[in-house]
Swiss-Prot record:
Residues 474-493 have a biased composition (Low complexity). PROSITE patterns: F_BAR, SH3. The gene is BZZ1. It is found in: Cytoplasm, Cytoskeleton, Actin patch. Belongs to the BZZ1 family. Plays a role in endocytosis and trafficking to the vacuole. Functions with type I myosins to restore polarity of the actin cytoskeleton after NaCl stress. Residues 429-495 are annotated as: Disordered. This is Protein BZZ1.
Length: 633
Protein backbone atom coordinates (compact mmCIF):
# COMPACT_ATOMS: atom_id res chain seq x y z
CA UNK A 1 0.00 0.00 0.00
CA UNK A 2 1.11 3.57 -0.41
CA UNK A 3 3.53 4.49 2.38
CA UNK A 4 3.25 8.18 1.44
CA UNK A 5 -0.37 8.49 2.55
CA UNK A 6 -0.69 9.66 6.14
CA UNK A 7 -3.81 11.09 7.74
CA UNK A 8 -1.59 12.45 10.51
CA UNK A 9 0.43 14.46 7.99
CA UNK A 10 -2.48 15.73 5.94
CA UNK A 11 -5.36 16.41 8.38
CA UNK A 12 -4.32 18.28 11.50
CA UNK A 13 -6.03 17.81 14.86
CA UNK A 14 -8.72 15.48 13.47
CA UNK A 15 -8.91 12.64 15.99
CA UNK A 16 -12.67 12.95 16.43
CA UNK A 17 -13.42 12.79 12.70
CA UNK A 18 -10.91 10.02 12.00
CA UNK A 19 -11.97 7.95 15.01
CA UNK A 20 -15.60 8.19 13.92
CA UNK A 21 -14.61 7.21 10.38
CA UNK A 22 -12.82 4.09 11.64
CA UNK A 23 -15.77 3.28 13.91
CA UNK A 24 -18.08 3.49 10.91
CA UNK A 25 -15.86 1.08 9.03
CA UNK A 26 -15.70 -1.37 11.93
CA UNK A 27 -19.47 -1.21 12.42
CA UNK A 28 -19.73 -1.86 8.73
CA UNK A 29 -18.13 -5.27 9.40
CA UNK A 30 -21.20 -6.19 11.44
CA UNK A 31 -23.40 -5.34 8.47
CA UNK A 32 -21.30 -7.53 6.21
CA UNK A 33 -21.21 -10.31 8.80
CA UNK A 34 -24.98 -10.22 9.09
CA UNK A 35 -25.25 -10.26 5.32
CA UNK A 36 -23.38 -13.57 5.04
CA UNK A 37 -25.34 -15.16 7.88
CA UNK A 38 -28.57 -14.23 6.19
CA UNK A 39 -27.12 -15.34 2.89
CA UNK A 40 -26.42 -18.79 4.34
CA UNK A 41 -30.09 -19.18 5.27
CA UNK A 42 -31.39 -17.87 2.00
CA UNK A 43 -29.20 -20.16 -0.08
CA UNK A 44 -31.54 -23.01 0.89
CA UNK A 45 -34.47 -21.19 -0.69
CA UNK A 46 -32.50 -20.31 -3.84
CA UNK A 47 -32.90 -17.30 -6.05
CA UNK A 48 -36.06 -15.59 -4.78
CA UNK A 49 -34.91 -15.04 -1.21
CA UNK A 50 -31.35 -14.43 -2.34
CA UNK A 51 -32.48 -11.66 -4.70
CA UNK A 52 -34.53 -10.07 -1.91
CA UNK A 53 -31.56 -10.08 0.43
CA UNK A 54 -29.33 -8.46 -2.17
CA UNK A 55 -31.82 -5.65 -2.63
CA UNK A 56 -31.95 -5.09 1.12
CA UNK A 57 -28.20 -4.68 1.36
CA UNK A 58 -28.08 -2.48 -1.69
CA UNK A 59 -30.21 -0.07 0.32
CA UNK A 60 -27.96 -0.38 3.35
CA UNK A 61 -24.94 0.28 1.18
CA UNK A 62 -26.56 3.40 -0.23
CA UNK A 63 -27.20 4.83 3.24
CA UNK A 64 -23.72 4.04 4.59
CA UNK A 65 -21.64 4.75 1.48
CA UNK A 66 -20.86 8.37 2.38
CA UNK A 67 -19.86 7.89 6.07
CA UNK A 68 -17.83 4.79 5.18
CA UNK A 69 -16.09 6.53 2.29
CA UNK A 70 -15.44 10.00 3.70
CA UNK A 71 -16.71 10.00 7.30
CA UNK A 72 -19.67 11.72 8.92
CA UNK A 73 -18.51 15.33 8.50
CA UNK A 74 -16.50 15.70 5.27
CA UNK A 75 -15.32 19.18 4.32
CA UNK A 76 -16.08 18.38 0.67
CA UNK A 77 -19.16 16.43 -0.40
CA UNK A 78 -18.19 13.31 -2.40
CA UNK A 79 -21.17 13.39 -4.76
CA UNK A 80 -21.46 10.01 -6.46
CA UNK A 81 -17.85 9.06 -5.69
CA UNK A 82 -17.47 6.01 -3.42
CA UNK A 83 -14.48 4.51 -1.68
CA UNK A 84 -12.80 1.57 -3.37
CA UNK A 85 -14.07 -0.71 -0.61
CA UNK A 86 -17.64 0.46 -1.15
CA UNK A 87 -17.28 -0.03 -4.91
CA UNK A 88 -16.01 -3.55 -4.32
CA UNK A 89 -18.93 -4.22 -1.97
CA UNK A 90 -21.36 -2.94 -4.59
CA UNK A 91 -19.91 -5.34 -7.15
CA UNK A 92 -20.26 -8.28 -4.78
CA UNK A 93 -23.93 -7.48 -4.20
CA UNK A 94 -24.52 -7.21 -7.95
CA UNK A 95 -22.98 -10.60 -8.60
CA UNK A 96 -24.88 -12.12 -5.67
CA UNK A 97 -28.15 -10.89 -7.13
CA UNK A 98 -27.38 -12.84 -10.33
CA UNK A 99 -27.00 -16.15 -8.50
CA UNK A 100 -30.35 -17.91 -8.56
CA UNK A 101 -29.74 -21.03 -6.54
CA UNK A 102 -27.40 -22.67 -4.14
CA UNK A 103 -27.27 -25.62 -1.73
CA UNK A 104 -26.64 -26.58 1.89
CA UNK A 105 -22.89 -26.91 1.55
CA UNK A 106 -22.61 -23.35 0.34
CA UNK A 107 -24.78 -22.27 3.28
CA UNK A 108 -22.43 -24.09 5.67
CA UNK A 109 -19.36 -22.55 4.04
CA UNK A 110 -20.76 -19.05 4.34
CA UNK A 111 -21.55 -19.58 8.02
CA UNK A 112 -18.19 -21.08 9.04
CA UNK A 113 -15.65 -19.42 6.76
CA UNK A 114 -17.04 -15.91 6.36
CA UNK A 115 -19.59 -14.80 8.98
CA UNK A 116 -17.74 -16.22 11.98
CA UNK A 117 -14.47 -14.76 10.72
CA UNK A 118 -16.08 -11.35 10.30
CA UNK A 119 -17.35 -11.52 13.87
CA UNK A 120 -13.88 -12.35 15.14
CA UNK A 121 -12.35 -9.63 12.98
CA UNK A 122 -14.73 -7.02 14.37
CA UNK A 123 -13.95 -8.08 17.94
CA UNK A 124 -10.17 -7.82 17.65
CA UNK A 125 -10.21 -4.63 15.61
CA UNK A 126 -12.67 -3.03 18.04
CA UNK A 127 -10.39 -3.94 20.95
CA UNK A 128 -7.46 -2.36 19.14
CA UNK A 129 -9.52 0.75 18.41
CA UNK A 130 -10.43 1.01 22.11
CA UNK A 131 -6.76 0.77 23.03
CA UNK A 132 -5.88 3.55 20.60
CA UNK A 133 -8.69 5.67 22.03
CA UNK A 134 -7.29 5.11 25.51
CA UNK A 135 -3.84 6.09 24.25
CA UNK A 136 -5.29 9.32 22.85
CA UNK A 137 -7.20 10.08 26.06
CA UNK A 138 -4.01 9.58 28.04
CA UNK A 139 -2.14 12.08 25.85
CA UNK A 140 -5.00 14.59 26.10
CA UNK A 141 -5.11 14.23 29.89
CA UNK A 142 -1.36 14.74 30.16
CA UNK A 143 -1.56 17.84 27.98
CA UNK A 144 -4.46 19.19 30.02
CA UNK A 145 -2.59 18.48 33.26
CA UNK A 146 0.37 20.49 32.00
CA UNK A 147 -1.96 23.34 31.05
CA UNK A 148 -3.47 23.10 34.55
CA UNK A 149 0.00 23.29 36.07
CA UNK A 150 0.58 26.46 34.07
CA UNK A 151 -2.63 27.98 35.42
CA UNK A 152 -1.66 27.00 38.96
CA UNK A 153 1.82 28.48 38.54
CA UNK A 154 0.25 31.71 37.27
CA UNK A 155 -2.09 31.81 40.28
CA UNK A 156 0.79 31.18 42.71
CA UNK A 157 2.81 33.91 41.03
CA UNK A 158 -0.05 36.42 41.26
CA UNK A 159 -0.55 35.59 44.94
CA UNK A 160 3.17 36.02 45.61
CA UNK A 161 3.12 39.38 43.84
CA UNK A 162 0.17 40.50 45.96
CA UNK A 163 1.95 39.41 49.14
CA UNK A 164 5.08 41.25 48.00
CA UNK A 165 3.09 44.41 47.39
CA UNK A 166 1.53 44.21 50.84
CA UNK A 167 4.99 43.79 52.41
CA UNK A 168 6.28 46.75 50.43
CA UNK A 169 3.40 48.92 51.64
CA UNK A 170 4.09 47.95 55.26
CA UNK A 171 7.76 48.77 54.84
CA UNK A 172 6.88 52.10 53.26
CA UNK A 173 4.73 52.97 56.26
CA UNK A 174 7.21 51.62 58.84
CA UNK A 175 10.77 51.33 57.57
CA UNK A 176 12.24 49.13 60.28
CA UNK A 177 14.50 46.09 60.13
CA UNK A 178 11.67 43.66 60.76
CA UNK A 179 9.60 44.97 57.86
CA UNK A 180 12.72 45.12 55.70
CA UNK A 181 13.42 41.45 56.40
CA UNK A 182 9.81 40.53 55.61
CA UNK A 183 10.01 42.52 52.40
CA UNK A 184 13.15 40.67 51.29
CA UNK A 185 11.60 37.29 52.08
CA UNK A 186 8.44 38.06 50.13
CA UNK A 187 10.46 39.32 47.19
CA UNK A 188 12.46 36.09 47.11
CA UNK A 189 9.25 34.02 47.22
CA UNK A 190 7.79 36.12 44.43
CA UNK A 191 10.88 35.55 42.29
CA UNK A 192 10.71 31.81 42.87
CA UNK A 193 7.07 31.74 41.82
CA UNK A 194 7.85 33.81 38.76
CA UNK A 195 10.62 31.44 37.71
CA UNK A 196 8.32 28.47 38.17
CA UNK A 197 5.65 30.24 36.13
CA UNK A 198 8.10 30.91 33.27
CA UNK A 199 9.20 27.28 33.30
CA UNK A 200 5.59 26.13 33.09
CA UNK A 201 5.00 28.47 30.14
CA UNK A 202 7.96 26.94 28.32
CA UNK A 203 6.78 23.44 29.11
CA UNK A 204 3.19 24.16 28.10
CA UNK A 205 4.29 25.61 24.76
CA UNK A 206 6.60 22.74 23.97
CA UNK A 207 3.99 20.20 25.04
CA UNK A 208 1.40 21.95 22.89
CA UNK A 209 3.68 21.71 19.86
CA UNK A 210 4.54 18.10 20.60
CA UNK A 211 0.87 17.23 21.05
CA UNK A 212 -0.34 18.76 17.79
CA UNK A 213 2.68 17.98 15.59
CA UNK A 214 3.76 14.62 17.00
CA UNK A 215 1.28 12.93 19.33
CA UNK A 216 -1.97 13.61 17.47
CA UNK A 217 -0.50 12.64 14.04
CA UNK A 218 0.82 9.43 15.63
CA UNK A 219 -2.66 8.51 16.87
CA UNK A 220 -4.23 9.42 13.51
CA UNK A 221 -1.77 7.17 11.68
CA UNK A 222 -2.61 4.34 14.09
CA UNK A 223 -6.30 4.83 13.31
CA UNK A 224 -5.40 4.80 9.62
CA UNK A 225 -3.52 1.53 10.07
CA UNK A 226 -6.47 -0.06 11.89
CA UNK A 227 -8.79 0.86 9.04
CA UNK A 228 -6.31 -0.36 6.44
CA UNK A 229 -5.88 -3.61 8.36
CA UNK A 230 -9.66 -3.94 8.32
CA UNK A 231 -9.61 -3.51 4.56
CA UNK A 232 -6.93 -6.17 4.15
CA UNK A 233 -8.77 -8.70 6.31
CA UNK A 234 -12.06 -7.87 4.65
CA UNK A 235 -10.57 -8.41 1.22
CA UNK A 236 -9.36 -11.83 2.32
CA UNK A 237 -12.81 -12.79 3.59
CA UNK A 238 -14.53 -11.52 0.48
CA UNK A 239 -12.18 -13.55 -1.63
CA UNK A 240 -12.89 -16.58 0.57
CA UNK A 241 -16.63 -16.13 0.14
CA UNK A 242 -16.13 -15.95 -3.59
CA UNK A 243 -13.99 -19.08 -3.70
CA UNK A 244 -16.65 -21.31 -2.09
CA UNK A 245 -19.13 -20.20 -4.70
CA UNK A 246 -16.76 -21.05 -7.53
CA UNK A 247 -17.55 -24.73 -6.95
CA UNK A 248 -21.18 -24.21 -7.90
CA UNK A 249 -20.52 -24.04 -11.58
CA UNK A 250 -19.04 -22.16 -14.45
CA UNK A 251 -21.69 -19.45 -14.49
CA UNK A 252 -21.32 -18.62 -10.82
CA UNK A 253 -17.55 -18.78 -11.19
CA UNK A 254 -17.64 -16.31 -14.04
CA UNK A 255 -19.70 -13.80 -12.07
CA UNK A 256 -17.54 -14.10 -8.99
CA UNK A 257 -14.38 -13.56 -11.00
CA UNK A 258 -15.83 -10.22 -12.00
CA UNK A 259 -16.41 -9.42 -8.32
CA UNK A 260 -12.88 -10.55 -7.45
CA UNK A 261 -11.32 -8.20 -9.95
CA UNK A 262 -13.01 -5.26 -8.23
CA UNK A 263 -12.10 -6.49 -4.75
CA UNK A 264 -8.45 -6.76 -5.73
CA UNK A 265 -8.55 -3.14 -6.79
CA UNK A 266 -9.69 -2.24 -3.29
CA UNK A 267 -6.29 -1.04 -2.12
CA UNK A 268 -6.22 0.11 1.51
CA UNK A 269 -4.54 3.29 0.35
CA UNK A 270 -7.46 4.14 -1.97
CA UNK A 271 -9.90 4.16 0.96
CA UNK A 272 -7.51 6.35 2.92
CA UNK A 273 -6.93 8.66 -0.05
CA UNK A 274 -10.61 9.42 -0.60
CA UNK A 275 -11.09 10.10 3.12
CA UNK A 276 -8.13 12.51 3.15
CA UNK A 277 -9.24 14.27 -0.03
CA UNK A 278 -12.74 14.98 1.29
CA UNK A 279 -11.68 15.94 4.82
CA UNK A 280 -8.83 18.40 4.16
CA UNK A 281 -9.41 21.57 6.16
CA UNK A 282 -7.76 24.85 6.99
CA UNK A 283 -6.23 24.29 10.40
CA UNK A 284 -4.37 26.85 12.45
CA UNK A 285 -1.98 25.94 15.20
CA UNK A 286 -3.10 27.19 18.64
CA UNK A 287 -1.17 30.25 19.76
CA UNK A 288 1.85 29.91 22.05
CA UNK A 289 1.50 30.68 25.71
CA UNK A 290 3.10 33.95 26.72
CA UNK A 291 4.18 35.45 29.99
CA UNK A 292 1.49 37.62 31.60
CA UNK A 293 2.68 39.93 34.37
CA UNK A 294 0.75 40.12 37.58
CA UNK A 295 -1.84 42.92 37.63
CA UNK A 296 -0.30 44.17 40.88
CA UNK A 297 3.38 43.60 40.06
CA UNK A 298 4.38 44.69 36.59
CA UNK A 299 7.40 42.83 35.29
CA UNK A 300 8.91 41.42 32.10
CA UNK A 301 9.47 37.84 30.93
CA UNK A 302 13.09 37.62 32.12
CA UNK A 303 14.01 35.23 34.94
CA UNK A 304 14.27 36.83 38.36
CA UNK A 305 17.66 35.94 39.83
CA UNK A 306 18.79 38.99 41.84
CA UNK A 307 20.68 36.88 44.39
CA UNK A 308 22.16 33.47 45.06
CA UNK A 309 19.02 32.44 46.94
CA UNK A 310 16.98 32.25 43.75
CA UNK A 311 19.92 30.59 42.00
CA UNK A 312 20.06 27.87 44.65
CA UNK A 313 16.39 27.08 44.04
CA UNK A 314 17.06 26.91 40.30
CA UNK A 315 20.15 24.71 40.84
CA UNK A 316 17.99 22.16 42.68
CA UNK A 317 15.46 22.23 39.87
CA UNK A 318 18.32 21.86 37.38
CA UNK A 319 19.76 18.86 39.21
CA UNK A 320 16.39 17.13 39.31
CA UNK A 321 15.82 17.81 35.63
CA UNK A 322 19.27 16.50 34.67
CA UNK A 323 18.69 13.36 36.70
CA UNK A 324 15.31 12.77 35.04
CA UNK A 325 16.68 13.47 31.59
CA UNK A 326 19.58 11.05 31.91
CA UNK A 327 17.38 8.25 33.27
CA UNK A 328 14.94 8.60 30.38
CA UNK A 329 17.50 8.97 27.59
CA UNK A 330 18.36 5.27 27.34
CA UNK A 331 14.72 4.24 27.53
CA UNK A 332 13.62 6.50 24.71
CA UNK A 333 16.56 5.60 22.49
CA UNK A 334 15.87 1.89 22.89
CA UNK A 335 12.18 2.40 22.17
CA UNK A 336 12.97 4.64 19.23
CA UNK A 337 15.18 1.93 17.77
CA UNK A 338 12.31 -0.56 18.00
CA UNK A 339 9.90 1.93 16.42
CA UNK A 340 12.33 2.57 13.59
CA UNK A 341 12.56 -1.15 12.85
CA UNK A 342 8.78 -1.57 12.93
CA UNK A 343 8.32 1.52 10.79
CA UNK A 344 10.69 0.11 8.19
CA UNK A 345 8.75 -3.17 8.14
CA UNK A 346 5.46 -1.31 7.80
CA UNK A 347 6.90 0.91 5.06
CA UNK A 348 8.12 -2.10 3.10
CA UNK A 349 4.69 -3.73 3.38
CA UNK A 350 2.90 -0.61 2.17
CA UNK A 351 5.21 -0.17 -0.80
CA UNK A 352 4.23 -3.67 -1.99
CA UNK A 353 0.50 -3.19 -1.63
CA UNK A 354 -0.52 -5.95 -4.05
CA UNK A 355 1.22 -8.68 -2.03
CA UNK A 356 0.81 -7.43 1.53
CA UNK A 357 -0.13 -10.01 4.15
CA UNK A 358 -3.00 -8.86 6.37
CA UNK A 359 -1.92 -10.89 9.41
CA UNK A 360 1.68 -9.68 9.28
CA UNK A 361 0.53 -6.12 8.75
CA UNK A 362 -1.85 -6.29 11.68
CA UNK A 363 0.75 -7.96 13.92
CA UNK A 364 3.17 -5.16 13.07
CA UNK A 365 0.47 -2.61 13.87
CA UNK A 366 -0.17 -4.17 17.30
CA UNK A 367 3.53 -4.37 18.11
CA UNK A 368 4.01 -0.75 17.04
CA UNK A 369 1.15 0.35 19.28
CA UNK A 370 2.64 -1.54 22.24
CA UNK A 371 5.96 0.29 21.79
CA UNK A 372 4.80 3.78 20.81
CA UNK A 373 2.57 4.21 23.87
CA UNK A 374 5.35 3.99 26.50
CA UNK A 375 7.77 5.74 24.14
CA UNK A 376 5.49 8.75 23.87
CA UNK A 377 5.03 8.86 27.63
CA UNK A 378 8.78 8.61 28.30
CA UNK A 379 9.56 11.18 25.65
CA UNK A 380 7.06 13.61 27.15
CA UNK A 381 8.70 13.19 30.55
CA UNK A 382 12.09 13.76 28.99
CA UNK A 383 10.89 16.93 27.28
CA UNK A 384 9.80 18.37 30.61
CA UNK A 385 13.27 17.79 31.99
CA UNK A 386 14.94 19.12 28.84
CA UNK A 387 12.89 22.33 28.78
CA UNK A 388 13.56 22.90 32.46
CA UNK A 389 17.30 22.49 31.88
CA UNK A 390 17.27 24.86 28.91
CA UNK A 391 15.09 27.42 30.70
CA UNK A 392 17.41 27.58 33.69
CA UNK A 393 20.76 27.42 31.89
CA UNK A 394 19.82 29.99 29.26
CA UNK A 395 18.37 32.55 31.67
CA UNK A 396 20.67 32.62 34.71
CA UNK A 397 23.41 35.32 34.53
CA UNK A 398 26.92 34.07 33.89
CA UNK A 399 28.28 35.18 37.24
CA UNK A 400 26.28 32.49 39.04
CA UNK A 401 27.52 28.91 39.30
CA UNK A 402 24.96 26.38 38.02
CA UNK A 403 27.06 23.34 38.83
CA UNK A 404 24.92 20.53 40.26
CA UNK A 405 27.76 18.29 41.44
CA UNK A 406 27.27 19.12 45.12
CA UNK A 407 23.47 18.82 45.19
CA UNK A 408 22.06 15.81 47.05
CA UNK A 409 18.65 15.12 45.54
CA UNK A 410 17.86 12.57 48.24
CA UNK A 411 17.46 15.45 50.68
CA UNK A 412 15.02 17.33 48.49
CA UNK A 413 11.38 16.63 47.76
CA UNK A 414 11.10 14.86 44.45
CA UNK A 415 8.68 16.11 41.85
CA UNK A 416 7.65 14.18 38.81
CA UNK A 417 7.84 15.74 35.35
CA UNK A 418 5.53 15.35 32.38
CA UNK A 419 7.60 16.56 29.44
CA UNK A 420 9.73 15.29 26.58
CA UNK A 421 11.33 16.75 23.52
CA UNK A 422 9.04 17.34 20.58
CA UNK A 423 9.50 17.51 16.88
CA UNK A 424 10.93 20.82 15.68
CA UNK A 425 13.21 21.94 12.90
CA UNK A 426 16.26 22.77 14.95
CA UNK A 427 19.45 22.02 13.04
CA UNK A 428 21.50 18.98 14.11
CA UNK A 429 24.80 19.64 15.85
CA UNK A 430 27.62 17.62 14.35
CA UNK A 431 29.85 17.91 17.42
CA UNK A 432 28.57 18.35 20.94
CA UNK A 433 29.94 20.98 23.33
CA UNK A 434 32.52 19.83 25.82
CA UNK A 435 31.29 18.77 29.22
CA UNK A 436 33.91 20.66 31.11
CA UNK A 437 31.34 22.56 33.12
CA UNK A 438 27.85 23.85 33.23
CA UNK A 439 28.22 27.32 34.63
CA UNK A 440 27.39 29.30 31.54
CA UNK A 441 28.45 30.15 28.07
CA UNK A 442 31.67 31.77 29.10
CA UNK A 443 33.09 34.52 31.22
CA UNK A 444 33.73 36.71 28.21
CA UNK A 445 31.15 38.12 25.78
CA UNK A 446 27.45 38.31 26.41
CA UNK A 447 25.44 35.15 26.78
CA UNK A 448 23.32 34.56 23.68
CA UNK A 449 19.92 33.39 24.86
CA UNK A 450 17.15 32.14 22.61
CA UNK A 451 14.15 34.03 23.95
CA UNK A 452 11.25 32.02 25.24
CA UNK A 453 8.96 34.31 23.25
CA UNK A 454 10.90 34.34 19.94
CA UNK A 455 11.01 30.64 19.15
CA UNK A 456 10.71 29.83 15.46
CA UNK A 457 7.84 27.75 14.24
CA UNK A 458 8.48 24.06 14.63
CA UNK A 459 7.61 21.35 12.10
CA UNK A 460 7.19 17.63 12.56
CA UNK A 461 10.35 16.15 11.06
CA UNK A 462 10.03 13.01 8.98
CA UNK A 463 6.27 13.31 8.81
CA UNK A 464 5.83 14.93 5.43
CA UNK A 465 5.09 12.57 2.52
CA UNK A 466 8.23 10.93 1.16
CA UNK A 467 9.12 10.17 -2.40
CA UNK A 468 8.38 6.60 -3.40
CA UNK A 469 12.07 5.82 -3.70
CA UNK A 470 12.96 6.90 -0.21
CA UNK A 471 13.46 4.28 2.48
CA UNK A 472 14.21 5.69 5.89
CA UNK A 473 14.19 3.68 9.08
CA UNK A 474 12.77 6.66 10.85
CA UNK A 475 10.00 7.38 8.33
CA UNK A 476 7.01 8.89 10.20
CA UNK A 477 8.69 8.59 13.61
CA UNK A 478 7.74 11.91 15.16
CA UNK A 479 10.88 12.71 17.15
CA UNK A 480 14.24 14.40 16.90
CA UNK A 481 17.59 13.80 18.49
CA UNK A 482 18.19 16.05 21.44
CA UNK A 483 21.37 18.01 21.67
CA UNK A 484 23.39 18.02 24.84
CA UNK A 485 21.53 20.45 27.07
CA UNK A 486 24.44 21.54 29.23
CA UNK A 487 26.22 24.76 28.44
CA UNK A 488 30.01 24.75 28.20
CA UNK A 489 32.23 26.75 30.49
CA UNK A 490 34.67 28.80 28.45
CA UNK A 491 38.30 29.50 29.45
CA UNK A 492 38.94 32.95 30.82
CA UNK A 493 41.57 33.44 28.12
CA UNK A 494 38.77 33.63 25.54
CA UNK A 495 37.14 36.69 27.15
CA UNK A 496 36.23 39.41 24.67
CA UNK A 497 36.78 37.23 21.58
CA UNK A 498 34.42 35.90 18.96
CA UNK A 499 34.31 32.14 19.19
CA UNK A 500 32.73 29.06 17.58
CA UNK A 501 31.00 27.08 20.34
CA UNK A 502 29.66 24.11 18.36
CA UNK A 503 30.26 22.65 14.93
CA UNK A 504 27.66 23.33 12.24
CA UNK A 505 27.49 21.93 8.69
CA UNK A 506 26.13 24.11 5.89
CA UNK A 507 22.55 23.18 4.86
CA UNK A 508 21.66 25.97 2.39
CA UNK A 509 23.57 28.10 -0.12
CA UNK A 510 23.50 31.19 2.10
CA UNK A 511 25.01 29.32 5.07
CA UNK A 512 28.59 28.31 5.87
CA UNK A 513 30.25 25.49 7.79
CA UNK A 514 31.97 26.26 11.09
CA UNK A 515 34.11 24.19 13.47
CA UNK A 516 35.26 24.93 17.03
CA UNK A 517 38.63 26.65 16.72
CA UNK A 518 37.77 28.63 13.57
CA UNK A 519 38.45 32.36 13.72
CA UNK A 520 35.33 34.36 12.93
CA UNK A 521 34.33 38.01 12.56
CA UNK A 522 30.89 39.61 12.64
CA UNK A 523 29.26 40.77 9.40
CA UNK A 524 25.64 41.32 10.49
CA UNK A 525 24.08 40.72 13.89
CA UNK A 526 21.06 38.53 14.55
CA UNK A 527 17.88 40.50 13.75
CA UNK A 528 15.65 38.14 15.71
CA UNK A 529 15.61 35.27 13.21
CA UNK A 530 18.07 33.13 15.18
CA UNK A 531 20.79 33.48 12.48
CA UNK A 532 23.94 35.63 12.45
CA UNK A 533 26.00 36.50 9.37
CA UNK A 534 29.74 36.04 9.92
CA UNK A 535 32.99 35.69 8.04
CA UNK A 536 34.95 32.50 8.72
CA UNK A 537 38.47 33.93 8.67
CA UNK A 538 39.89 30.40 8.72
CA UNK A 539 38.16 29.24 5.52
CA UNK A 540 37.47 32.62 3.93
CA UNK A 541 33.72 31.92 3.61
CA UNK A 542 30.94 34.37 4.49
CA UNK A 543 27.38 33.35 5.34
CA UNK A 544 24.77 32.57 7.98
CA UNK A 545 25.16 30.32 11.03
CA UNK A 546 22.85 29.64 14.03
CA UNK A 547 23.34 32.41 16.59
CA UNK A 548 23.48 29.92 19.48
CA UNK A 549 26.41 28.07 17.87
CA UNK A 550 28.78 31.04 18.20
CA UNK A 551 29.74 33.68 20.74
CA UNK A 552 30.15 37.26 19.59
CA UNK A 553 31.88 39.61 22.02
CA UNK A 554 30.03 42.72 23.11
CA UNK A 555 32.78 44.83 21.52
CA UNK A 556 32.46 43.16 18.13
CA UNK A 557 31.38 45.38 15.24
CA UNK A 558 30.51 44.77 11.63
CA UNK A 559 33.60 44.74 9.41
CA UNK A 560 34.08 48.14 7.73
CA UNK A 561 34.43 46.72 4.21
CA UNK A 562 31.19 44.79 4.65
CA UNK A 563 29.04 47.62 5.99
CA UNK A 564 25.63 48.07 4.42
CA UNK A 565 22.03 47.19 5.05
CA UNK A 566 21.45 44.05 7.07
CA UNK A 567 20.91 40.99 4.83
CA UNK A 568 17.42 39.64 4.42
CA UNK A 569 16.72 37.08 7.11
CA UNK A 570 16.46 33.63 5.46
CA UNK A 571 13.31 31.59 6.09
CA UNK A 572 13.39 28.89 8.79
CA UNK A 573 15.70 26.09 7.73
CA UNK A 574 13.69 23.13 6.37
CA UNK A 575 16.45 21.25 4.59
CA UNK A 576 15.82 18.17 6.73
CA UNK A 577 12.28 17.82 5.38
CA UNK A 578 11.79 15.41 2.47
CA UNK A 579 10.41 16.77 -0.79
CA UNK A 580 6.69 16.31 -1.31
CA UNK A 581 5.49 15.31 -4.75
CA UNK A 582 2.13 14.69 -6.39
CA UNK A 583 1.25 12.64 -9.46
CA UNK A 584 -1.13 14.04 -12.07
CA UNK A 585 -4.11 11.77 -12.81
CA UNK A 586 -5.89 14.14 -15.21
CA UNK A 587 -4.66 16.51 -17.91
CA UNK A 588 -4.95 20.26 -17.34
CA UNK A 589 -4.13 23.10 -19.73
CA UNK A 590 -2.83 26.31 -18.14
CA UNK A 591 -5.39 29.14 -18.33
CA UNK A 592 -3.10 31.95 -17.21
CA UNK A 593 0.54 32.98 -16.75
CA UNK A 594 0.47 31.91 -13.10
CA UNK A 595 -0.58 28.33 -13.94
CA UNK A 596 1.21 25.28 -15.39
CA UNK A 597 -0.05 22.55 -17.70
CA UNK A 598 0.05 18.94 -16.52
CA UNK A 599 -0.53 15.54 -18.14
CA UNK A 600 -1.49 12.22 -16.55
CA UNK A 601 1.58 10.62 -14.99
CA UNK A 602 3.51 13.88 -14.49
CA UNK A 603 5.36 14.08 -11.17
CA UNK A 604 4.98 17.55 -9.66
CA UNK A 605 7.15 18.88 -6.84
CA UNK A 606 4.96 20.69 -4.29
CA UNK A 607 6.32 24.10 -3.33
CA UNK A 608 3.29 25.40 -1.45
CA UNK A 609 0.33 23.23 -0.47
CA UNK A 610 -3.35 23.87 -1.07
CA UNK A 611 -4.55 26.69 1.21
CA UNK A 612 -8.19 25.70 0.80
CA UNK A 613 -8.68 27.38 -2.58
CA UNK A 614 -8.40 24.10 -4.49
CA UNK A 615 -5.05 25.08 -6.05
CA UNK A 616 -1.51 23.90 -5.27
CA UNK A 617 1.70 25.72 -6.24
CA UNK A 618 4.38 23.39 -7.64
CA UNK A 619 7.08 22.74 -10.25
CA UNK A 620 6.87 20.38 -13.23
CA UNK A 621 9.43 20.05 -16.04
CA UNK A 622 11.22 23.19 -14.83
CA UNK A 623 8.06 25.33 -14.85
CA UNK A 624 6.50 26.71 -11.68
CA UNK A 625 2.86 27.68 -11.20
CA UNK A 626 -0.58 26.74 -9.90
CA UNK A 627 -2.47 23.58 -10.78
CA UNK A 628 -5.80 22.07 -9.56
CA UNK A 629 -5.21 19.97 -6.44
CA UNK A 630 -8.04 17.57 -7.33
CA UNK A 631 -6.33 16.68 -10.63
CA UNK A 632 -3.48 14.96 -8.76
CA UNK A 633 -2.94 12.41 -6.06
Amino acid sequence: MSADLSIGNEIKDSFKETHKWVQNNLKWLKDIEQFYRERAKLEKDYSERLSRLSAEYFNKKSSTSVPISVGDTPTTTPGSIEAAGVVAWNEILSQTDMISKDHDQLSTDFENHVANQLSGLFTKLDMTLSKINGFNNDMVNKKDNIYHELEKAKKDYDEACSTMEMARNRYTKASNDRNKKKLDEKEMEMNKCKNEYLIKINQANRTKDKYYFQDVPEVLDLLQDVNEAKTLFLNDLWLKAASVENDLGANVSKRLQAANSVVKQNKPSLNTAIFIKHNLKNWKEPQDFVYKPSPVWHDDEKFAVPSSLEVEDLRIKLAKAENDYNSLQDKTQNELSKLSTLNKIKHEMKTNEDNINATKFYDTLKEYLNVVSPFTSHETLKLQAEVQIESIQNNVPEEYDLSTDNIDLSKTKKKSGIFSKFKHNILNVDSKPSSGGSTGNGNGGPLHITSLFNTSRRTRLGSAPNNAGEDSDNNSIRTTSTNNTKKTTQNSSDDGKNKVLYAYVQKDDDEITITPGDKISLVARDTGSGWTKINNDTTGETGLVPTTYIRISSAATVKANDRGPAPEVPPPRRSTLPVRTMEAIYAYEAQGDDEISIDPGDIITVIRGDDGSGWTYGECDGLKGLFPTSYCK
